[in-house]
């Protein structure tokens, strides 16, 4: 039920790859081992221990910006056309007006969006395949609380359909620097599709509904709430349906003709990968490019 709620599809339609290696090492034996011995016997299907930045995961990307130099980044700059000729990407158009000539393109755009922007367009077969692959969208609802702590859990999961959300986490439990010493926060994840009513609904109404559930769960009281907000994240996760590999292989076979194109990230590779995978992949791309 949790998987169906998370992905929006019956589990019978999902590929085992959607576990993202979290099932690796999972067996009756390891389950018993962890139950008896606890955290010291965590196996590879669970997070186990890991390093976490003092001020949140965003620090990684702040440091990348500092290293590359802020003037080298363009914000509010939507790619609206990707022009190619023969076996090379020649230029990209920004906001339908500014054209940039390029030597090499690295894309983490959702595959379907990338293909839609290609000029000339791909064959109809490729476009039809790209329209059939799906992404799951997420709404984050954030609560800032005048309370020292909620509990010690890294994450809390909610498979019951009576709740809109699937997961709640308390950032302070990752790093104590994520909140003042006498305050905390909760981040609530709501998976959906952009066509769902919940995505299209008034966000203040959504916040109030989630807040009511959290009050009923006794996570905090109304007078402990300092502030709240919500963020929409489109194309947060690729949905790996059964036999998705055949579809993606055809798309990759088509895109392999471009000798100056690299794809990366969850959306670009259509893979349920993680930040450390993306960092490694990005480094490999840059190292290979610097050798050319």
Where is each model-derived feature located?
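Charged, often glycine-rich, active-site loop that binds/positions anionic groups
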Residues: 237-247
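Mid-domain catalytic core of redox enzymes
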Residues: 78-200, 204, 208-219, 231, ...
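General small-molecule cofactor/ligand-binding pocket signal
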Residues: 74, 226-229, 262
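Short FAD-binding loop at a beta-strand-to-alpha-helix junction that anchors the flavin cofactor
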Residues: 186-187, 251-272, 278
């Amino acid at each position: 039920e949790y998987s169906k709620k998370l992905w929006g599809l019956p589990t019978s339609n999902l590929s085992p790859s959607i576990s993202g290696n979290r099932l690796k090492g999972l067996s009756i034996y390891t389950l018993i081992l962890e139950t008896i011995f606890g955290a010291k016997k965590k196996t590879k299907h669970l997070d186990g221990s890991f390093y976490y930045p003092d001020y949140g995961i965003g620090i990684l990307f702040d440091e990348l910006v500092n290293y590359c130099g802020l003037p080298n980044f363009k914000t509010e700059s939507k790619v609206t056309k990707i022009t190619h000729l023969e076996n090379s990407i020649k230029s990209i158009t920004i906001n339908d007006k500014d054209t940039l000539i390029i030597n090499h393109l690295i894309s983490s755009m959702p595959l379907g969006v990338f293909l839609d922007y290609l000029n000339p367009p791909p064959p109809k077969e490729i476009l039809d395949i790209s329209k059939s692959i799906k992404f799951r969208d997420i709404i984050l609802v954030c609560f800032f609380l005048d309370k020292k702590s909620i509990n010690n859990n890294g994450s809390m999961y909610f498979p019951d359909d009576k709740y809109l959300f699937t997961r709640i986490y308390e950032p302070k439990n990752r790093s104590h620097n994520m909140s003042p010493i006498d305050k905390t926060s909760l981040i609530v994840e709501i998976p959906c599709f952009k066509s769902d009513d919940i995505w299209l609904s008034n966000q203040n109404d959504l916040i109030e509904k989630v807040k009511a559930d959290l009050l009923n769960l006794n996570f905090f009281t109304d007078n402990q709430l300092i502030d709240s907000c919500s963020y929409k994240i489109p194309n947060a996760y690729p949905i790996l349906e059964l036999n998705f590999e055949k579809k993606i292989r055809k798309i990759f076979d088509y895109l392999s003709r471009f000798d100056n194109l690299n794809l990366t990230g969850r959306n670009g590779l259509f893979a349920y990968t993680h930040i450390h995978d993306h960092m490694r992949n990005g480094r490999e791309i840059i190292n290979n490019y610097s050798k050319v």
